[in-house]
Amino acid sequence: MQDLQKIIDDAFENRANLSPSAAPAAVRDAVASVIAGLDAGRLRVAEKIDGNWTVNQWIKKAVLISFRLADNEVMAGGTNQYFDKVPTKFGDYTPEQFREGGFRVVPPAVARRGSFIGRNVVLMPSYVNIGAYVDEGTMVDTWATVGSCAQIGKNVHLSGGVGIGGVLEPVQAGPVIIEDNVFVGARSEVVEGVIIEENAVLSMGVYIGQSTKIYDRATGEVTYGRVPSGAVVVPGSLPSADGKYSLYCAVIVKRVDAQTRAKTGINELLRGA
């Protein structure tokens, strides 16, 4: 792994000189190995170690380099054709591979090669980008998007139209992380490497980036970039210092209780392949 990382780091420093027709075989092989590892879930752009999230920047670099090494090619998809550098994850899947994967893919859902889909995941007509990790039992509902390298935990519900930001453009230091058992309400957006800790609930229409104020009404505290475990968050606003206008914020209104769980719990009947 150390050798692989060194090849990727060196290639990234030399990325301006890489192209589909000009790249050393060692670089091609290293990038292909990383993409295959991401696709199978053996590698992750970010992982939780001793309770803290660590970003593997070299893996993210490999994803970026992969775009320099590939030409666009035509891809068939139902009645349509596509033209891109990254193949789809399921383009050459056999029925046996789908059964072995243990997930469901509802047309016209798309996942790119280099993303990982765990067992009992349901992909409604949605989009999962390269480098993303979607863990077991998660529902990605209709028109939801999981951005490049985003990390989605177990038993998460991403409601219709949810946007989970990626890291490739604009380039972000770390991916968005949605931990286990999180519920994200319809049309909400989480971007710019924000972390939503386990068991949190975001209501419909909550938008959180690194500069979004997260106001806890119980304590009056304002934080940024992380929603604490078990928080229930709704959209709100805070007044300006001069009282002349208000600006958007996310408001922690309470902690998850039995009533909240009854409204946001997953339906086991919908899981399983």
From Swiss-Prot:
GO molecular function: 2,3,4,5-tetrahydropyridine-2,6-dicarboxylate N-succinyltransferase activity; nucleotidyltransferase activity
Amino acids binding substrate: R104, D141
Pathway annotation from the record: Amino-acid biosynthesis; L-lysine biosynthesis via DAP pathway; LL-2,6-diaminopimelate from (S)-tetrahydrodipicolinate (succinylase route): step 1/3
CDD domains found in the cross-reference section: LbH_THP_succinylT
Pfam families hit by this protein: Hexapep_2 (PF14602), THDPS_N_2 (PF14805)
Any one of the GO BP annotations: diaminopimelate biosynthetic process
GO CC terms, sorted: cytoplasm
EC number: 2.3.1.117
Alphabetical keyword list: Acyltransferase, Amino-acid biosynthesis, Cytoplasm, Diaminopimelate biosynthesis, Lysine biosynthesis, Repeat, Transferase
InterPro entries according to UniProt: DapD_Trfase_Hexpep_rpt_fam, Hexapep, Hexapep_transf_CS, THP_succinylTrfase_dom1, THP_succinylTrfase_N_sf, Trimer_LpxA-like_sf
Catalyzed reaction equations: (S)-2,3,4,5-tetrahydrodipicolinate + succinyl-CoA + H2O = (S)-2-succinylamino-6-oxoheptanedioate + CoA
Disulfide bonds: none
Main subcellular location of this protein, as a coarse class: cytoplasm
Keyword Zinc: no
Localization per Swiss-Prot or TrEMBL: Cytoplasm
Assembly and oligomerization: Homotrimer.
Family of the protein in this entry: Belongs to the transferase hexapeptide repeat family.
PANTHER family: 2,3,4,5-TETRAHYDROPYRIDINE-2,6-DICARBOXYLATE N-SUCCINYLTRANSFERASE, MOLYBDENUM COFACTOR GUANYLYLTRANSFERASE
Name recorded for this polypeptide: 2,3,4,5-tetrahydropyridine-2,6-dicarboxylate N-succinyltransferase
